[in-house]
Every structure is written in C-alpha cells, then in structure tokens.
A protein has these predicted regions:
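Outer-membrane beta-barrel "beta-signal"
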Residues: 69-75, 166-185
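Extracellular/periplasm-exposed beta-strand and loop segments of Gram-negative cell-envelope proteins
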Residues: 22, 49-65, 98-114, 144-153, ...
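Residues that define the transmembrane beta-barrel architecture of outer-membrane proteins
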Residues: 1, 15-17, 27-31, 62-68, ...
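Short loop/turn motifs that connect adjacent beta-strands in outer-membrane beta-barrel proteins
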Residues: 11-15, 42, 77-87, 126-133, ...
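Residue-level signature of outer-membrane beta-barrel architecture
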Residues: 25, 37, 74-76, 123-125, ...
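Single conserved hydrophobic/aromatic residue that forms the stacking wall/gate
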Residues: 1-9
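Glycine- and aromatic-enriched membrane insertion/assembly motifs of diderm outer-membrane
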Residues: 18-100
Length: 185
C-alpha cells in the first residue's frame, strides 16, 4: 500500500484513458480489446469488443462471436491520493452480439442476437506506473434466440429453434490494463 501511495504522489499526470486486454478471453482464443475512460475521480465508462471468428468446415468446427458492451463503474473508497481506475469498483453493464458455435460435424448453434446485462464487482491492482491487473465478475441475466442446425453434405440444415435464458455469472475478467497519462495536474 505504501508503494502505491508513493507511485501516486510521484506521478502527478492524470490517467486519461486505459487500454485493456482480458487474459481469460485470450485463453479461449477470443481476441478482445477494452477502452476505459475516467469521468472524474469516482466514475468511469468501460467499452469492450470481442471477435473470435474461427472456422474450419473440413473438420466441422466453427467458433464465431461478434460482441460489444458498455459498463458504467463507480470506484469505491477514498480517491484523493489514489491513482484513477485503481481499487475496488461496482458497475452496471449491458452487452450484446451474434454467434455461431459448431464443435463437431453433427450439430451447431447460431444466434442472430444475444443480450446480457447485470452488475459487476471488481478490483484493480497497480503493478507499475502504467500497468494494472484487474479482476472482475459480473452477475446478471442473459437471453438469446438460437437455431440448432446439422450438416448434410456440406450444407447447414436448420433442425429446430429455441430460446435460452440464464440468470447467474455472465462475465469474468482478469485483464492487463495500460494506463495512458495526460497533462500534469
């Protein structure tokens, strides 16, 4: 804690933007990027985008997801001597996207749209002047309409459709964050 306070006291430049990458999405082979903008000392706006777009029709594999989201965050605790975008936070989020998942040659699921919203809790720990490690978990509601399909002689045949609703954990993050500083205070 003392080291963090010393870093904040030494560096009087404000964080104007943060660029992020969720390591958990990377492990799932899902390229992603996030941008977070501080709004004063206590609030911030986080935007995210993920886009794994992998397919191999020869092996009956498709892993495609195009998704975006936005989250408003409130940073907790005393903020006077703290670096922006560090510490504990609560957030409210909404995201949506399209998907197509096929993990074997027999069947797959395609969603024209999915939507999720909920609340997050997280903690951002400053590792260096410009580097932060962020942990967060989102709990909320997810809804989608999907089409189940099977393949026949290389063509996709729609077999059924349905709706899926889920209440519970909808988001988990371990992110590397790069703080970009602006002018001096």
């Amino acid at each position: 804690i003392r080291r963090q306070r010393q870093m904040c006291i030494r560096d009087r430049r404000r964080t104007v933007i943060a660029l992020k990458n969720n390591i958990l999405y990377d492990l799932a082979l899902a390229p992603n990027v996030e941008v977070e903008l501080p709004v004063g000392q206590r609030w911030s706006l986080n935007m995210e985008y993920k886009c794994p777009w992998w397919s191999n029709s020869k092996h009956g594999f498709c892993y495609q997801l195009l998704s975006g989201g936005v989250e408003a965050r409130c940073w907790l605790g005393k903020r006077k001597n703290r670096e922006r975008l560090t510490g504990h936070f609560l957030g409210i989020y909404a995201e949506g996207g399209v998907y197509d998942f096929q993990f074997d040659k027999d069947k797959g699921y395609r969603g024209n749209y999915y939507a999720a919203s909920g609340l997050t809790y997280g903690y951002s720990h400053q590792l260096a002047r410009h580097l932060v490690l962020e942990f967060s978990l989102g709990i909320g509601y997810l809804a989608t309409e999907y089409r189940k399909y099977t393949t026949y002689e290389g063509d996709l045949i729609w077999t059924s459709s349905g709706r899926y609703h889920f209440m519970g954990p909808t988001k988990a993050k371990i992110s590397l964050v790069w703080l970009i500083k602006g002018r001096r205070r």
